[in-house]
From Swiss-Prot:
GO biological process, one term: chromosome condensation
S-S bonds: C7-C15, C39-C47
Protein location: Nucleus; Chromosome
Record's subunit section: Cross-linked by interchain disulfide bonds around the DNA-helix.
Keyword Disulfide bond attached: yes
Tissue specificity note: Testis.
GO molecular function, one term: DNA binding
Swiss-Prot/TrEMBL keywords: Chromosome, Developmental protein, Differentiation, Disulfide bond, DNA condensation, DNA-binding, Nucleosome core, Nucleus, Spermatogenesis
UniProt function note: Protamines substitute for histones in the chromatin of sperm during the haploid phase of spermatogenesis. They compact sperm DNA into a highly condensed, stable and inactive complex.
Listed InterPro entries: Protamine_P1 (IPR000221)
GO cellular component term of the entry, any: nucleoplasm
Pfam families: Protamine_P1 (PF00260)
Protein name (record): Sperm protamine P1
Amino acid sequence: MVRYRCCRSQSRSRCRRRRRRCRRRRRRCCQRRRVRKCCRRTYTLRCRRY
């Protein structure tokens, strides 16, 4: 199974708009590719494979 972790390439201002949604779901990072959801702590939008 491929996992993704947070990447800080996106601007935080865009991330803050989705802050509530992200906190509610409690996801640290995106689970799929190209899915724009904030990470739980850093609130970044993109994820990187690892």
